[in-house]
């Protein structure tokens, strides 16, 4: 059976906060940290919108959530490394707030819900910190600028602000069964939303209508937060990688690119599908779609523990070059085109990134200053560990802003046939993106959203 395949059963348990805390502590100790230290983290504070009394949208601080599983704002936690005790501090009852919002979660309720040893109120935090520092503990680990002014570490011998954040970022790369279950659930809900958009596409008059269809499908499944701003791009708008206007009329455009995903309990999905709005590809859009689908299939099939992501990214470019040569858009020697980075004109972004609590999750070690343009925007570098989740999102785009400088360059333009290229501008762009779990000997694709040509066209035409 696949890992966390029955995700609803897995999610009946508690989020594994203590296992995460122990994992982080072990990383700190392995780097020479204090085995008698204490970890301290704070939740995001509830804030008001500027110049009015309305609450700003709340997004839990991911570092805090990773060691608590707690979605409550204005909370704190401590983890005593030697005793492995995890203590959560939640806001006390404020009578004025109860009038408006009802009774908050009690410490008893929190103890039952979360994977913690103790739960106190935030009023108790300084007394608790003093008591732990007076025992064997000597070092407090925290994240700079994420400690409230009234919280004091004065009784600790050492205050360490450099190790905790990278420790959590490293540990977040490899996922527990519970985390994989959350990502699976987010993918299932987002798949239903993508399918709803495909079914509604043929009658839509504006991109915003289809964005609304996606959001409705998520919210009615109790996924009220999106992992990122949806991209709903018809026709040539899809040539813009992060097009977010989602408000243009839909008329005679052939393709729609939908890059959208909900989150479930702070864990993201990130799915892209490109499909013909009326259910039928043009010859040009079909040719490009087949290239991108081949890019994705080959790259996913290359995944397993230890594979070097840079090499998989190179594979995507080589598949793209082969396909564009066959269409006549590119001309010349494939190896020469690869070496001179001509394919970057059509595939300018990285193949994918780690996925977890953030859409672009931690631990990727990107190098945005890389002088090699092929790798500059590759958000994940190096080898992929078992239980990491990576997006695989190849694309081919016809963006005038990106391609035209190549056409004006005497050395580069000889590899591009402008007369053939002219037929493809209207395609805009094609991207296909799945969320893939890396396993010891291969992979598990967590994204069941239709993408094969027959599957998507039948779905669109079924309405």
Curated annotation (Swiss-Prot):
EC code(s) of this entry:
3.4.11.9
What keywords are assigned to this protein?
Answer: Aminopeptidase, Hydrolase, Manganese, Metal-binding, Metalloprotease, Protease
Q: Name one GO molecular function term.
A: manganese ion binding
Lineage top rank: taxon: Eukaryota
Which enzyme class, named as a word? hydrolase
Provide the binding site for Mn(2+) 2.
259, 270, 433
Record-level GO BP terms: proteolysis
InterPro entries (alphabetical):
Aminopep_P_N, Creatin/AminoP/Spt16_N, Creatinase/aminopeptidase-like, Pept_M24, X-Pro_dipept-like
What SMART domains does its record include? AMP_N
Essential cofactor(s): Mn(2+)
Residues annotated as transmembrane: none
Q: How is the cofactor bound?
A: Binds 2 manganese ions per subunit.
Reaction equation(s) it catalyzes: Release of any N-terminal amino acid, including proline, that is linked to proline, even from a dipeptide or tripeptide
Q: Which Gene3D superfamilies match?
A: Creatinase/methionine aminopeptidase superfamily, Creatinase/prolidase N-terminal domain
What CDD domains does its record include? Prolidase
Q: Which SUPFAM superfamilies is this protein grouped with?
A: Creatinase/aminopeptidase, Creatinase/prolidase N-terminal domain
| Record-listed Mn(2+) 1 binding positions | 270, 393, 433
**Pfam families xref list:** AMP_N, Peptidase_M24
This chain's function reads: Catalyzes the removal of a penultimate prolyl residue from the N-termini of peptides.
Assigned protein family: Belongs to the peptidase M24B family.
- Protein name as catalogued: Probable Xaa-Pro aminopeptidase pepP
């Amino acid at each position: 059976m696949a890992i966390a395949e029955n995700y609803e059963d897995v999610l009946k348990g508690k989020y594994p906060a203590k296992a995460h805390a122990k994992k982080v502590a072990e990383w700190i100790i392995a780097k020479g940290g204090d085995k008698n230290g204490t970890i301290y983290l704070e939740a995001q504070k509830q804030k008001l919108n500027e110049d009015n009394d309305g609450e700003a949208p709340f997004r839990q601080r991911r570092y805090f959530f990773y060691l608590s599983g707690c979605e409550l704002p204005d909370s704190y936690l401590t983890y005593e490394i030697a005793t492995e005790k995890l203590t959560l501090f939640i806001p006390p009852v404020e009578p004025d707030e109860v009038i408006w919002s009802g009774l908050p979660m009690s410490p008893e309720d929190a103890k039952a819900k979360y994977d913690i040893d103790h739960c106190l109120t935030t009023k108790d935090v300084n007394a608790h910190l003093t008591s732990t520092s007076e025992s064997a503990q000597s070092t407090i680990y925290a994240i700079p600028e994420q400690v409230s002014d009234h919280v004091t570490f004065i009784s600790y011998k050492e205050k360490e602000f450099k190790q905790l954040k990278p420790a959590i970022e490293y540990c977040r790369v490899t996922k527990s069964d519970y985390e994989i279950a959350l990502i699976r659930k987010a993918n299932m809900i987002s798949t239903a939303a993508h399918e709803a958009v495909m079914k509604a596409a043929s009658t839509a008059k504006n991109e915003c209508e289809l964005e609304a269809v996606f959001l409705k499908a998520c919210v009615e499944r109790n996924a009220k937060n999106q992992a990122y701003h949806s991209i709903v791009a018809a026709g040539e708008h899809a040539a813009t990688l992060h097009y977010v206007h989602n408000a243009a009329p839909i008329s005679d455009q052939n393709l729609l690119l939908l890059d959208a995903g909900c989150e479930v309990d702070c864990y993201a999905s990130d799915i892209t599908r490109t499909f013909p709005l009326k259910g039928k590809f043009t010859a040009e859009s079909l040719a490009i779609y087949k290239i991108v689908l081949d890019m994705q299939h080959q790259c996913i099939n290359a995944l397993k523990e230890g594979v070097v992501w840079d090499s998989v990214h190179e594979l995507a470019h080589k598949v793209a070059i082969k396909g564009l040569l066959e269409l006549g858009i590119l001309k010349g020697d494939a190896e020469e085109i690869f070496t001179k980075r001509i394919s970057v004109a059509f595939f300018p972004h990285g193949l994918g990134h780690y996925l977890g609590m953030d859409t672009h999750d931690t631990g990727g070690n990107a190098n945005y200053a890389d002088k090699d343009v092929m790798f500059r925007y590759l958000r994940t570098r190096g080898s992929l560990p078992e239980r990491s989740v990576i997006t695989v999102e190849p694309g081919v785009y016809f963006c005038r802003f990106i391609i035209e400088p190549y056409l004006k360059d005497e050395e580069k333009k000889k590899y591009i046939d402008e007369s053939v290229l002219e037929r493809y501008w209207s395609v805009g762009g094609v991207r296909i993106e799945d969320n893939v779990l890396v396993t010891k000997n291969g992979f598990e694709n967590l994204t069941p959203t239709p993408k094969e040509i027959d599957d998507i066209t039948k779905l669109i035409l079924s309405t």
